């Protein structure tokens, strides 16, 4: 992922998708019904060329609006395959709303480790 641009993170594996709410083609969660949903994510840093990268993550509603409480950043020195961000928030959704995971790097580019970056959501109310 390059520097200075929020990028939707493609997820390579679906561990649980019993209700079919995760759209793997478009890499986002689609609310099946109206309600309150709990979302979370883990982003694991993987070095490209420099450990000076500063990693951010967030959850985004319908491709444009950052969900309140979902933004996180690690601003200390990063260690490849050890530095991680954990995000968690709740949000009211209408059936058909989408939620996606986005990542961002400051200072230097980097990767989000595919085998340990995760995104999840469930209806709680």
Q: Where do the model's predicted regions map?
A:
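Extracellular jelly-roll beta-sandwich "head" domains, especially the C-terminal globular C1q domain
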Residues: 1-125
């Amino acid at each position: 992922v390059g520097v200075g641009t929020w990028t939707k993170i493609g997820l390579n594996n679906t561990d649980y998708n019993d209700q079919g709410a995760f759209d793997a083609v478009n890499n986002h969660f689609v609310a099946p019904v109206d309600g309150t949903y709990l979302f979370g994510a883990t982003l694991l840093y993987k070095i490209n060329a420099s450990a000076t990268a500063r990693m951010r993550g967030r959850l985004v509603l319908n491709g444009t609006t950052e969900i309140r409480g979902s933004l996180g950043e690690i601003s200390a020195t990063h260690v490849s395959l050890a530095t991680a961000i954990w995000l968690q928030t709740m949000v009211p959704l209408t059936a058909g709303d989408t939620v996606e995971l986005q990542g961002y790097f400051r200072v230097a580019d980097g990767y989000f480790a595919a085998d340990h970056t995760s995104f999840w959501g469930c209806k709680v109310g």
